[in-house]
């Protein structure tokens, strides 16, 4: 099936499958049934089978799923069988935290550059990458093969910076700014609004507290 036809809900579950299957491999588990997967994933076994059937199924009736094979195949679907070079725009607390996160490289995401407008930060090294100034960005992108930019800027700077990234060939933006970016159709954006996640947590906590007061 063409992956463009697959629902966003399915795509958002794939990293969870991948993470859990990786944990199973670390524990030495070689095979697992859809029922066992459903318990951990908190979705029905039927839903798991439907999700995986979008990509060919991968299971065998009466056997379940080969954990190593399924882990490898989902990794390929997620594009984790290749290295993606990534730059970080904004070297504040969040940008530095992303730059220091070692798990990215284990998943094939290599941070190759960090940029900021603050001259005080220029030249500071984070895991081997010296912070560069934003006016160096266009030439850097011409000279280097970069697929992804993580945007960790204030809201008022994000749109202009996103336009600069697009103009210089970036096709995927991981956006942590507090707005939804408007980009051309051929540019992929993943918006990560941390405050919205916290508000959902607050809602669920409020529901829990209200329910247990009854």
Description of each model-found segment:
Residues 22-26, 127-214:
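Phosphate-bearing ligand-interacting subdomains
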Residues 95:
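N-terminal Rossmann-fold NAD(P) dinucleotide-binding loop
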Residues 105-127:
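NAD(P)-binding Rossmann-fold cofactor-contacting core
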């Amino acid at each position: 099936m063409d992956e463009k036809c697959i629902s966003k809900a399915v795509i958002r579950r794939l990293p969870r499958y991948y993470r859990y299957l990786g944990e199973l491999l670390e524990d030495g588990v070689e095979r697992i049934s859809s029922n066992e997967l459903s318990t951990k994933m908190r979705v029905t076994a039927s839903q798991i089978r439907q999700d995986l059937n979008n990509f060919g199924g991968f299971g065998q009736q009466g056997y379940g799923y080969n954990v190593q094979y399924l882990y490898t195949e989902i990794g390929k679907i997620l594009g984790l069988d290749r290295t993606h070079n990534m730059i970080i725009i904004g070297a504040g607390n969040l940008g530095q935290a992303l730059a220091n996160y070692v798990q990215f490289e284990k998943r094939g995401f290599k941070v190759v550059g960090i940029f900021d407008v603050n001259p005080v930060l220029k030249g500071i090294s984070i895991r081997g990458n010296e912070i560069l100034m934003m006016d160096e960005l266009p030439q850097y992108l011409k000279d280097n093969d970069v697929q992804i930019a993580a945007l960790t800027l204030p809201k008022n700077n994000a749109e202009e910076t996103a336009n600069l990234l697009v103009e210089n060939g970036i096709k995927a933006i991981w956006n942590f700014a507090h707005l939804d970016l408007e980009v051309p159709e051929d540019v992929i954006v993943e918006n990560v609004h941390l405050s919205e996640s916290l508000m959902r947590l607050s809602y669920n906590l409020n529901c829990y507290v209200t329910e247990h007061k009854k």
